């Protein structure tokens, strides 16, 4: 019979398990010896006792720090309960299940309290996330300087049409167009960890231009339509103004293919490594647009660059096909679960040609980084980068591949903390729930970065999800439409990706038997 263990001595509980018994963390069975190893590579009871006490005290201190930015004192208790509920095991992390698990003797009253707190209370999401950032980033930076600011968006499939921002659009979770909500976020990362520091729902044009829908969902009156790259640039400008430690901007082709986004980053004096489409127009190395046509003495002189039938750019795909065999190098960028992560890459210094016929000067030289796995018939990924001209191919690859950190953020936030489980329809509740999920996530990260996990444990046991059937990364060629995969939003699709971290959080563990955390395959990028 399953028994929920809350607030008990973690060490005694683990030591009471037999070899055949499992401890379920986040819905997955973990052997007692594995938990002990995750806690610090040792089963010493004294160390685990101390850690449990410290983690409980750390949670109280963390919540107390957050309370200072949410206004009324009567919001302190629902804040703590909401975060506590998100950290506890459970298939659903919507308001009603959170009420049941945090106040089983008064579920109805707790439900009303949490519902008001997340859906209606006018506290600031930006202030809460700012306090989380100020608490967590110093702990992350103990493991190394911030290397990257990572932009991405994540989708939440929906069946109805009344939830704020829902529309038929690209859904990253499904890898295709579907009915969903999409939020844009900015994470800061080093090699050890990452943290989302900005989050905003993308409001499609059909919503932005519909006063009735906006009113029902209580969309802020001053909010106007912005594209996802425009939202991302706004988040980046805000982070700059807040004095966040700078990093290279990383983004996929959904952002990198937007010339305005790249130009905006350059105007902000930020370097980037961003995905682009194979159709990107580029000049061959050493080439560029023709200078303005000489003035004939009649009419107004022109200052615009030009092309000719004999002098014109080519696509990134065509340039890749023309590269010599010795231009390609096999680069290893990270240690995977079972093998090193490696592929073939080429890097070329060139000028993008994007609409340069409307410019008075050519684009500056950048790196075009191309990935062509040996088992593929053609290159699979392309990036543009403004990293310095003396950067090496391994440096370019290592930086580009750090974007996996934001995918890990989304994976943990969705599968472990219920990021996609909010059932309300309004703007405020959508953002409040996400901010609280990020706050809970920040607490887990702060514990991990305070007591570093075993490197060998991480390398051998951290898992990531397999991709759903029909998944197509944004920017990839469009294959024949695949049937829509069946996704159960109530059940995680993979094992806990940060087992060591979860086991060290608090003594909120569930005794039982479940799927092995080593049963799924590691997703790499």
What does each of the following model-derived ranges do?
Residues 260, 385, 393-400, 415-432, ...:
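Short, solvent-exposed helix-loop connector elements
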């Amino acid at each position: 019979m399953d028994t929920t263990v809350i607030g008990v001595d973690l060490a005694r509980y683990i030591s009471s398990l037999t070899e055949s018994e499992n401890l379920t963390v986040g819905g997955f069975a973990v052997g007692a010896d594995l938990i002990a190893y995750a806690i610090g590579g040792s089963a010493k009871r004294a160390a685990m006792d101390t850690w449990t006490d410290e983690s409980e005290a750390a949670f109280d201190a963390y919540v107390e720090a957050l309370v200072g930015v949410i206004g009324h004192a009567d919001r302190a208790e629902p804040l703590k309960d909401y975060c506590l509920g998100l950290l506890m095991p459970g298939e659903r992390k919507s308001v009603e299940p959170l009420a049941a698990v945090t106040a089983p003797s008064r579920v109805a009253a707790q439900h009303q309290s949490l519902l008001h707190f997340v859906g209606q209370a006018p506290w600031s999401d930006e202030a809460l996330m700012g306090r989380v950032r100020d608490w967590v980033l110093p702990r992350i930076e103990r493991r190394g300087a911030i290397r990257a600011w990572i932009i991405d968006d994540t989708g939440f499939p929906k069946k109805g049409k009344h939830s704020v921002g829902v529309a038929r659009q690209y859904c990253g979770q499904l890898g295709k167009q579907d009915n969903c909500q999409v939020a844009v976020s900015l994470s800061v990362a080093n090699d050890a960890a990452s943290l989302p520091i900005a989050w905003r729902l993308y409001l499609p044009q059909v919503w932005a231009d519909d006063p009735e829908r906006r009113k029902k969902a209580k969309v802020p009156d001053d909010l106007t339509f912005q594209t996802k790259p425009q939202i991302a640039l706004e988040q980046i400008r805000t982070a700059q103004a807040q004095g966040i430690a700078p990093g290279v901007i990383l983004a996929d082709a959904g952002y990198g293919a937007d010339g305005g986004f790249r130009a905006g980053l350059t105007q902000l004096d930020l370097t980037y490594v961003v995905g682009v489409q194979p159709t990107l127009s580029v000049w061959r190395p050493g080439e560029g647009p023709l200078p303005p046509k000489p003035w004939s003495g009649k009419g107004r002189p022109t200052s615009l660059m030009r092309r000719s039938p004999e002098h014109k750019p080519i696509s990134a795909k065509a340039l890749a096909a023309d590269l010599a065999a010795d231009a390609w190098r096999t680069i290893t960028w990270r240690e995977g679960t079972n093998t090193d992560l490696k592929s073939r890459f080429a890097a070329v210094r060139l000028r993008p040609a994007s609409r340069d016929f409307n410019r008075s000067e050519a684009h500056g030289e950048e790196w075009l980084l191309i990935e062509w796995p040996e088992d593929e018939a053609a290159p699979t990924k392309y990036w543009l980068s403004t990293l310095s001209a003396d950067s090496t191919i391994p440096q370019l690859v290592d930086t580009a591949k750090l974007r996996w950190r934001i995918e890990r953020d989304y994976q943990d936030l969705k599968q472990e903390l219920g990021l996609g489980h909010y059932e309300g329809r309004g703007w405020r509740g959508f953002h409040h729930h996400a901010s609280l999920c990020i706050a809970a996530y920040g607490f887990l990260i702060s514990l991990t970065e305070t007591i570093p996990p075993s490197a060998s444990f991480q390398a051998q046991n951290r898992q990531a999800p397999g991709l759903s059937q029909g998944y197509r990364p944004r920017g990839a060629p469009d294959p024949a439409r695949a049937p829509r995969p069946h996704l159960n939003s109530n059940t995680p699709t993979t094992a806990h990706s940060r087992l060591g971290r979860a086991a060290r959080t608090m003594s909120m563990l569930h005794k039982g038997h479940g799927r092995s955390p080593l049963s799924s395959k590691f997703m790499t990028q």
